[in-house]
């Protein structure tokens, strides 16, 4: 449980993270992720062809009336986005990695990148950046993957936890 002071710090720090969705297909997932990002002051980048219209009623329902309070942007060109983003610290979330998301070190300004619900992140991107790949471990091998919104929530809160702990540790040593 966070104190009010920790929550305030978390909100300030989390603005420096970006959640990226490559070609999301399911409106309610994107709406829920947008709401999650908005609640934490995290930017949301939607990249490539979307499997829905931004006016979709299910997208709006999942995001409720918060869309005006969410820092989000749509980048139509996947290649251009990758050229710019991959100059930063980024994490590719995929089922095709053996490294757990908890083994990664998250810092301010990081990008948490997730693929579409149906195809994930393209193999060409994964092969070009194997050191940036990580996964959410699952015990049951019969389950191929988790829901995209659930996955974003799990990884986002781990990144926020690490950033907050790091920031709190630095502040403690300043006094």
Report the location of each language-model feature:
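RNA substrate-binding interface of SAM-dependent RNA methyltransferases
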Residues: 2-94, 160
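Short, structured coil segments at secondary-structure junctions
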Residues: 40, 128-130
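Conserved small/polar residues in nucleotide/adenosyl-binding loops
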Residues: 168-175
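Short glycine-rich anion-binding loops that position phosphate/pyrophosphate groups of nucleotides
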Residues: 95-98, 116-119
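Glycine-rich, Arg-bearing micro-motifs that act as flexible, cationic patches
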Residues: 139-145
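Active-site helix-initiating loop/hinge in glycosyltransferases
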Residues: 29, 145-147
């Amino acid at each position: 449980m966070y104190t009010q002071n920790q929550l305030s710090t978390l909100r300030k720090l989390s603005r420096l993270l970006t959640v990226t969705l490559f070609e999301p297909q399911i409106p309610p997932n994107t709406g829920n992720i947008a709401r999650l990002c908005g609640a934490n002051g995290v930017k949301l980048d939607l990249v490539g062809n979307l499997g829905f219209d931004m006016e979709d009623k299910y997208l709006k329902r999942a995001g409720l009336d918060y869309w005006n309070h969410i820092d989000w942007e749509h980048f139509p060109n996947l290649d251009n986005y990758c050229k710019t983003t991959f100059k930063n610290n980024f994490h590719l979330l995929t089922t095709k990695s053996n490294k757990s998301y908890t083994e990664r070190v998250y810092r301010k300004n990081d990008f948490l990148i997730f693929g579409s619900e149906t195809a994930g992140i393209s193999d060409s991107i994964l092969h070009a950046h194997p050191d940036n790949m990580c996964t959410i471990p699952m015990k049951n091998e019969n389950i191929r993957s988790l829901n995209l919104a659930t996955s974003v929530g799990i990884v986002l809160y781990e990144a926020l936890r690490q950033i907050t702990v790091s920031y709190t540790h630095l502040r403690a040593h300043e006094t």
